[in-house]
A protein has these predicted regions:
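Short, compositionally biased low-complexity segments
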Residues: 93-113
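P-loop NTPase switch/coupling surface
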Residues: 1-98, 126, 140
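Residue-level recognition of the N-termini of beta-strands and the immediately preceding loop/turn
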Residues: 60, 144, 199-203
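A structural signal for short, well-ordered beta-strand segments and their strand-loop junctions
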Residues: 63-66, 143-148, 156
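Short amphipathic alpha-helical segments and helix-helix/interface helices
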Residues: 52-53, 132, 222-226
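Amphipathic alpha-helical domain-onset/packing element
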Residues: 59, 106-149
Length: 234
């Protein structure tokens, strides 16, 4: 009996010690979290379970962009089918395939025209028209044109008073904007089926959004983002 009592006493002490350690650890991590959020707490009117369900179905976007944003996209030497995903993890970078996706769209449009699929070809033509309009908003210049060279399979941007340039030779300010815009477009594109209506909901965190932007862009960047992506919480 004495032995059993001793064992029980030891277990109770161990459980008590373990509980105190757990409480201490929990208090530490809560304190660290509060420090990292600077006292800011997020409250959602939807459960995390529902958010996760929508995210996994591709109906909710979660993205994070660092302060040192530099847009880079692979320049393809030949046509390659881009397999867009219905959803991307926060650490994935679909924007790296953007130029490949543009080329894929152009070839799909050409095949649709030759195959008599006029509705499909028209949908893609409208997509490119709307993307060109978006570029005009970003550069704040109505002379902006997106030009495709059928010989080299390369896209370039042309505007009055400047030599043509491509997506990988943008100034740091415009590269920082396109890094966000293009990435979000591709995160939503499969679900929207080329509608260019980026109405999917989501949460996007941008570190030092004004970095690299000149004064005019700093004033207009949030208006641009919330107009193009009306249901994203930036």
């Amino acid at each position: 009996k004495t032995t059993k009592k001793g064992i029980q006493y030891y277990r109770e002490k161990q459980d008590e010690r373990s509980l105190k350690q757990s409480e201490s650890s929990l208090e530490y991590w809560v304190e660290q979290y509060q420090k990292s959020t600077a006292g800011i707490w997020l409250n959602f009117n939807t459960s995390f379970t529902e958010i996760r369900k929508q995210f996994e179905a591709g109906n909710f976007v979660v993205a994070y962009y660092k302060a040192d944003r530099i847009f880079t996209s692979v320049q393809p030497k030949h046509v390659e089918k881009v397999q867009l995903k219905s959803g991307y993890a926060i650490n994935e970078m679909p924007r790296t395939e953007f130029i490949k996706y543009l080329l894929d769209l152009k070839m799909t449009q050409a095949l649709a025209i030759s195959g008599g699929k006029t509705d499909k070809a028209h949908t893609i033509a409208i997509w490119f028209e709307k993307f060109e309009q978006l570029l005009k908003q970003i550069f704040d210049d109505e002379s902006v044109k997106l030009v495709f060279d059928e010989e080299t399979f390369q896209f370039s941007i042309e505007m009055d008073g400047r030599e043509p340039f491509d997506f990988n030779t943008l100034s740091s300010g415009y590269a920082a904007i396109l890094d966000i815009v293009v990435d979000l477009i591709l995160r939503m594109e499969r679900q929207l089926n080329r509608s260019f209506d980026f109405a999917i909901s989501g949460i996007v965190l941008i570190d030092e959004i004004e970095t690299h932007l000149h004064l005019e862009l700093q004033k207009n960047i949030m208006k641009l983002l919330t107009t193009v992506f009306p249901n994203i919480q930036f």
